[in-house]
Amino acid sequence: MSTTTSTTITEADENAIRDLVALAQESQSDTEALMALHTAETAIVNLAGRRVLGRETYAKAMADALASPLSDVLTTVEIVDVRLATRDVAIVSCTKTVHDRRSGVDVSTELPSTGALTYVTTRSHGGWRVALAQTTPILTPTNDD
């Protein structure tokens, strides 16, 4: 008797996960809608390396950011790959692009505008939710030789 399970993603699951990522992007300025897409235990590591643990803490961090000039910083996400780790856990590899529309900010001294974003999503009774989002900056080589 085999105890292994298939980790081949179905078209329906992949579409649901892609929809989740798209909805997260669309909801980035709506804290309530964004939080509904995350598990209660979610962990977030942003482009700057700030770690936020738990949906309540994440909601406060997002509300604070949206009440500041950071509300003029939006991101877009392009999915590179979706794969199952287990039947109910998927790893989503993305490229995140930051669009900083704040005035008076010297973007040359800011963080890179592109990052490698990895989501870990989990399936629950309510569908797929984000359990972890981690973004690693993608550094652009400089010509300072």
What residue spans do the PLM features occupy?
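Short, cysteine-centered beta-strand-loop-beta hairpins and adjacent loop/turn segments enriched
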Residues: 98-110, 139
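Hydrophobic/aromatic beta-strand elements that line small-molecule binding cavities or substrate pockets
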Residues: 58, 62, 77-83, 96-98, ...
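A solvent-exposed, acidic/Ser-Thr-rich amphipathic alpha-helical stretch
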Residues: 14, 31-88, 111
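Terminus-proximal functional modules
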Residues: 15-16, 20, 88-90, 95
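A short, structured loop/turn motif at beta-sheet edges
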Residues: 82-91, 121-129
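Generic short beta-strand segments
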Residues: 43, 93-101, 136
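Short beta-strand edge/turn micro-motifs at domain boundaries
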Residues: 2, 112-144
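Short, low-complexity N-terminal intrinsically disordered segments enriched in polar/charged residues
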Residues: 1-40, 142-145
